Every structure is written in structure tokens, then in C-alpha cells.
Amino acid sequence: MKATMLLAVVVAVFVAGTEAHPHVCTSYYCSKFCGTAGCTRYGCRNLHRGKLCFCLHCSRVKFPFGATQDAKSMNELEYTPIMKSMENLDNGMDML
């Protein structure tokens, strides 16, 4: 019983720290997750030094010729200085 209550508290804390936003992503870093497809729904994870933005749903880009392009994978993204700093932050959080 106590273990179940503890698990419920841990899940509640995690969910409370994540906010989902149904509007178009305005963050440059968050939009990079989707590449050219764009982000239609994103979330922000609260961290001790700010928020980490991540995309929950990438839209598809429709071209006038009828072709569609799926969202880019993380391996195809540009390795920008912002992404380097976020990776360093992620590695630092893993050490804790």
C-alpha cells in the first residue's frame, strides 16, 4: 500500500513538471526537433535552471506537387551550439 502511494506521488511530481502546449511551437530549439516539418504540439520540462522544450507531435509539410515530407530524425538535425549546450546539460543531469 505504501509503495503504491509512493509511486503515485512520484508520477504526480513528474507529470506536474511537464506542461503540454497545443499551439504552434515558438521556441527555436524546440522547432529544430521537427526540422522543416514544424512542431504542432510541444512540451516543456521544468529544470532547476529553466525549461527544456521538446516536441510531442511534428506536422508534415505538404508541397504543392502533392509530395509529403516526414519529420526529420534527430540524426539529421544540424548540430548547433544550442544543441551542444543542451546535450552538455543532459549529460550533467545524468551524472546527478
Swiss-Prot record:
Description of post-translational modifications: Contains four disulfide bonds.
Please verify whether the record's keywords include Secreted: yes
Q: Which GO terms describe its cellular component?
A: extracellular region
Q: Biological process (GO) annotations?
A: defense response to bacterium; defense response to fungus; killing of cells of another organism
Which positions carry the signal peptide feature in this UniProt record? 1-20
Q: Where in the cell is it found?
A: Secreted
Q: Which organism is it from?
A: Mytilus galloprovincialis (Mediterranean mussel)
Predominantly, its location class is secreted
What is this protein identified as? Answer: Myticin-B
Propeptide residues are 61-96
Reported function: Bacteriolytic activity against Gram-positive bacteria M.luteus, B.megaterium and A.viridans and Gram-negative bacteria E.coli D31. Possesses antifungal activity against F.oxysporum.
Q: In which tissues is it expressed?
A: Hemocytes.
Source organism, top-level taxon: Eukaryota
Give the UniProt keywords, A-Z: Antibiotic, Antimicrobial, Disulfide bond, Fungicide, Secreted, Signal
Q: Pfam families per the record? A: Myticin-prepro
